Amino acid sequence: MKRFLNLMMLAVLAFGMMACGEKKLTQDDLKKAELTLMNEEGSLNMEAVPVAVEQFCKFVEQNPNDEAAPQWLFKALQVEIKAGASEKAIELCDKLVKDYPTFENNPAALVMTASEVYDSQLHDLDKARATYQKVINDYPNSDWAKNAEKMIEFVGMTPEEIFSKIVMSEMEEVEGEW
């Protein structure tokens, strides 16, 4: 009898644990999490970042074939870039491009990763150039490829150096027209 009661207790516990499984996230849950990302001053609420990004990624994990999945992965990437979480941003960009190769915002994701992560945050100029080159090679007819061609010229430069280079280039064009 005691053995039977132990087995029943184990079965009830196992059933209870299964019933307490992970909640399936909805897009409404994600929209609520997204609203927590900005504070009253309009800047990123760093305390909300881990929870929101975790929810965005969990939705993608739970619903990999949902048409909104790549958009939420892209949103997670944008948040991690803004938060300065370079390694996490790189992982998210890689996952986005690999798992959703036809997603329309992949070129934007790559350009943001090249510019904000590799160039500005990590100062890994070779990876920044390689990522821009990937955009040029993989999306040659996109506006992002045209931007990447220009951005390669500016890798490693400060905003002041970029401005100076642009002004000098425009001055040379004007002089050539005379």
Where are these regions (language model features)?
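Structural register within alpha-helical repeat arrays
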Residues: 32, 76, 113-114, 152
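Terminal, low-structured helical/coil segments at or just beyond the last alpha-helical repeat
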Residues: 129-130, 134-138, 143-178
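Bacterial signal peptide processing site
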Residues: 21-23
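Residue at a conserved register position within TPR or TPR-like alpha-solenoid repeats
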Residues: 43, 80, 118-119, 156
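C-terminal motif of bacterial Sec signal peptides marking the signal peptidase cleavage site
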Residues: 16-19
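Helix-turn-helix repeat elements of alpha-solenoid scaffolds
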Residues: 43-55, 82-94, 122-125
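Short solvent-exposed coil/turn linkers within tandem alpha-helical repeat scaffolds
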Residues: 59-69, 98-107, 122, 136-150, ...
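Post-signal-peptide N-terminal segment of Sec-exported extracytoplasmic proteins
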Residues: 27-31, 35-75
